[in-house]
Amino acid sequence: MATFDFEKSLAVVIGIDQYCNGIAPLQTAVADSQAVASLLAHNYEYQVLSLLDEAAQLTGLQELIQHTLPSLVSANSRLLLYFAGHGIAQHGDNGPAGYLIPQDAMPGNVDSYLSMVSLHDALAALPCRHFLAIFDCCFAGAFRWSSTRKVTVVDDVIYRERYDRFRQNPAWQVITSSSYDQPAMDVLSLRDERGEVVDSQSQRHSPFAAALLQALQGDADSSPPA
């Protein structure tokens, strides 16, 4: 698979099933992350850094975005960030305030969460030419409010000319499994809202991850719908 002249293709894959402190476990986040990591490494020549369960505690995530990524990413790199786990959103002055829930988060204590604003700011400071974030968690769409810049929603159909511009020029893209305005969920009763399906190898995945994996294996739409 062509790498489009990138010096480095780096993927950070985060998946959390087993939460601490009474937060309900998830059933497929780790399996989803492992499957995504395998495809990115073998089919797309990515160097993959995986943080699963205990490796995805708050201090580990902060170390990742503040120190590890800046030391690994160059101007001609492409970076992909995949997160599967719990997410929440709260009302903020400028729109929903989104948070990713680390493995060791304390329910009700936002200081123990990873805010989407801090994540966005750390990622935006990286010099990589291409960046893609994929969030499979509740309220993932709140990430768009983390930026003070105008955010453009990509059309359902991307024609070849526009795709080539994305590929050749600096680009920042975000894909989410959920919108920002889902009904608020009590953080004290976080549940597995991601759902699950079973693939042809009897592996359980969230519906979003199953569709993503199918696309990464070459079954994504490649022409406008009829």
Predicted ranges, named:
Residues 15, 36, 81:
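Terminal peptide-recognition signature
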Residues 42-52:
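Short beta-strand elements in bilobed, periplasmic/extracellular small-molecule ligand-binding domains
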Residues 26-41:
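Short catalytic helix/loop segments, enriched in acidic residues and glycine
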Residues 8, 58-84, 88-150, 225-226:
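Caspase-like (clan CD) cysteine peptidase catalytic core
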Residues 15, 33, 52, 128-226:
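Active-site-proximal C-terminal subdomain of hydrolase catalytic domains
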Residues 22-27, 50-54, 108:
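Second-shell loop/turn segments in exported
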Residues 2-25:
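Short glycine-rich His-centered loop
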